[in-house]
Amino acid sequence: MKRFDPRSLWRPVVWICRFRHRRGYGVHSPFAFQLITRVFYERGEFYAYRPLAVVRRTEACGQSERLDRLMLRLVNDVQPRRVVLWGDAVGVTRRYVEAGCRRARIDEVGCGALPAAKGYDMLYARRPADGLALFEAFAAQAPDRAVAVFEGIHRSRRRAAEWKAVCSHPRATVTFDLYDLGIVFLHPKLNSQHYLVNF
């Protein structure tokens, strides 16, 4: 039986406030529009959804199936070579990342510091205590076209302030605020833009 989460009562209010930011309306960048329509809002049945649903029933899950499926689609679109998973209880999310890109090397670092000079293409951070410091450590060693994903960016005022600081970082060019997740692209050739998405 699922535990009741009081934040679920707030979810309809958030959805109504973000209603005009759905499905890519008003987005003019081809890169951002493609990502919103073909990754965030993809409704097709991916090849790995059914086997991963079986795994999900047997293992402890850290986040919702909806967010894990989004991670699979994002990894499938980005195709990173090296991924680092930061935080506790990322086991099921790791399976989704592996299914999205089988050739990616995946490291789990728990809640410790990121290994220096590893050249990670993608960072997934589950509710980091200091998101800005973690992003700065990632951005210092990340190659161009890297991606950082932060979970729980609106869980508290402190995390929301950290998310704003991450968005204003010089290497963060395109950011997406999906309320539950924050996605940062480090693409130097793209114009700096911050998108609010009703996901």
Predicted feature residues:
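A short alpha-helical cap/connector motif
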Residues: 1-144, 154-199
